[in-house]
C-alpha cells in the first residue's frame, strides 16, 4: 500500500471512506525536511493530537475516528504503524492555517520590533520579548506546499483568500476560524499551564466534513505545531527554553553551513524534550 500524499512529516493513505494519517519520525524546520530522523517523534505527535482532540471536542469536532491500529486495515497492523497512525474523516481542507499567539516570540516579535504590529494588528508600545499578550491574537497564514513558505496575512486578507476557494463563504469561514482558534487556544493554554507548560503560540488546520461543517484536521497542539515553554522558569525579556523543535531551529540558525543535518546530540535532546512535554501534559508515559 502506498501513500496518496507525503507531507513534510506525514504520509496519508486512502482507506475508502476515510484516510489513514501516519506521522513519521522526520523533522522539518523553516519549511525544510531535515536529513535526520527523530525516533518516537511520530508517536508523540499522534498521541498528543489524540489527547487534545479528546479534550476539545466540546468546542469543535475533529477528524479523528480512531488511533488504534486494530480498527485499521491489516496493512497497518505492523509495528511501524502502531502508535503513530490515526484513522481520520476525509475533509475538504481550508487553505488557511489558524495561528494564535498568546506570548511575544518568533516572527511576531520580529515584526513588532520593526513597526509595532503583528500581521497588521497594532499592539501597545513597550512590550518585551516573551511577554504575555493582553489577549491572544489571531494571525492567519496561507498554507504552503513542500519547498514553499507559509505566508502570514491579515484577517481581511484571509477573508479574500477563503472567498477565492469558497465563493460567498469567505467572511463566514474566516470568522469561524478566528473564533474557534482563539477558543481552542484559551482552553488548552489554561489546561497546559495547570500542568506546568506555557503554550506560547500554536497553529490549527481546519476542513469541511461531508455535511459542510468546519472541523479540526491535521495535528493539534504538538511540539511540531506549537511553542511549549516550562512555566517554572518563565521570565520575559528574552527567549525562553522550550519543549519543542525550537531547540533544533536555534542550532540551525547558529550553524548556517549545516546542510540541513543536525548532530546526533541535538537529535537526542530534541526527542527528550518531545517526550517530556507529552508526559507533563498528559500525565502518562508514552507507550
Each language-model region and where it sits:
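Active-site loop/lid in soluble adenylation, ligation, and acyl-transfer enzymes
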Residues: 1-145, 258-287
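Coil-to-beta-strand transition motifs
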Residues: 18, 93-95, 195-199, 211-214
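Intrinsically disordered, low-complexity acidic/polar segments
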Residues: 30, 109-110, 211, 225-227
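Conserved metal-phosphate-binding beta-hairpin within the catalytic cores
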Residues: 100, 199-220
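Anionic ligand-binding catalytic core segments
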Residues: 114-118, 122-172, 216, 220-281
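A long amphipathic alpha-helix within ATP-dependent nucleotide-binding catalytic cores
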Residues: 168-200
Amino acid at each position: 500500500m502506498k501513500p496518496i500524499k507525503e507531507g513534510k512529516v506525514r504520509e496519508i493513505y486512502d482507506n475508502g471512506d476515510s484516510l489513514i494519517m501516519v506521522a513519521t519520525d522526520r523533522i522539518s524546520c523553516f519549511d525544510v525536511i531535515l536529513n535526520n530522523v527523530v525516533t518516537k517523534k511520530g508517536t508523540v505527535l499522534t498521541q498528543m493530537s489524540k489527547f487534545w482532540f479528546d479534550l476539545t471536542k466540546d468546542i469543535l469536532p475533529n477528524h479523528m475516528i480512531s488511533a488504534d491500529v486494530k480498527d485499521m486495515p491489516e496493512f497497518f497492523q505492523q509495528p511501524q504503524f502502531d502508535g503513530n497512525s490515526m484513522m481520520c474523516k476525509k475533509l475538504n481542507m481550508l487553505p488557511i492555517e489558524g495561528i494564535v499567539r498568546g506570548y511575544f516570540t518568533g516572527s511576531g516579535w520580529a515584526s513588532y520590533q520593526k513597526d509595532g504590529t503583528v500581521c497588521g494588528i497594532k499592539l501597545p508600545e513597550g512590550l518585551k520579548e516573551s511577554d504575555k499578550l493582553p489577549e491572544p491574537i489571531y494571525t492567519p497564514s496561507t498554507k504552503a506546499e513542500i519547498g514553499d513558505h507559509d505566508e502570514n496575512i491579515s484577517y481581511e486578507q484571509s477573508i479574500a483568500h477563503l472567498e477565492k476557494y469558497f465563493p460567498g463563504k469567505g467572511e463566514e469561514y474566516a470568522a469561524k476560524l478566528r473564533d474557534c482558534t482563539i477558543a481552542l487556544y484559551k482552553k488548552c493554554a489554561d489546561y497546559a499551564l495547570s500542568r506546568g507548560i506555557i503554550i506560547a503560540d500554536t497553529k490549527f488546520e481546519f476542513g469541511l466534513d461531508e455535511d459542510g461543517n468546519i472541523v479540526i484536521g491535521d495535528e493539534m497542539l504538538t511540539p511540531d505545531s506549537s511553542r511549549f515553554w516550562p512555566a517554572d522558569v518563565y521570565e520575559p525579556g528574552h527567549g525562553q527554553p522550550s519543549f519543542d523543535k525550537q531547540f533544533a531551529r536555534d542550532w540551525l540558525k547558529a550553524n548556517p553551513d549545516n546542510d540541513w543535518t543536525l548532530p546526533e546530540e541535538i537529535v537526542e535532546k530534541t526527542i527528550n524534550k518531545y517526550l517530556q512535554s507529552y508526559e507533563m501534559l498528559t500525565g502518562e508515559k508514552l507507550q
